[in-house]
Amino acid sequence: MTGPPRSYTGRRDLIAEKLEPYFQISAMLPKNTRPTSETAEEFWDNSLWCSWGDRETGYTRTVTVSICQVADGEREAEGVRDMMRLECPAGLDLRTPNPEAYEITGQRPGEFVFVLGYLGHVRAIVGNCYIEIMPMGTRVELSKLADVALDIGRSVGCSAYENDFTLPDIPTQWRNQPLGWYTQGLAPYLPGLSDPKDAAEG
């Protein structure tokens, strides 16, 4: 491949292919109802968002990937380090694996990856591309997603893309859940998931 796919669906499908060994994405269904959230679209360039849920409920097992372009990757990485120092217990070694948060060092120049256990996601920066992988209910260790997060940053990137997004078919059983609410950019009645960028702003 000489470059990333040019369309939203091409990039979503490539992300799904990268994640397949970890989550069996092929056994899940797409669930986001926008190619990105309004908040991410307003504040970040070339933002892209894709999410999948288990076929039975749509929320028992979910995987969400968020990508956007940042102005300065190294500055963004330093911002993540500052956030960890502020929000994690004092004295915690943030460069050694632990349940709260840590940076996996020794990456290629301009690449950074953080395992944020207390937030439930992996965050990677590749050049000026910012990637988050957020699994819920999958029992996959976040540390195992570091390499694929970097891989997505290298292969999918965060350049401009053609928006050929189409609404997914929402299964009837998802709509008939006893509990739930509507979250911007997601299918209705799907508890337990919100846009990571929106959450960060809130």
UniProtKB/Swiss-Prot annotation:
Domain of life, per lineage: Bacteria
Name of the protein in its database record: Protein Rv0740
Organism lineage: Bacteria, Bacillati, Actinomycetota, Actinomycetes, Mycobacteriales
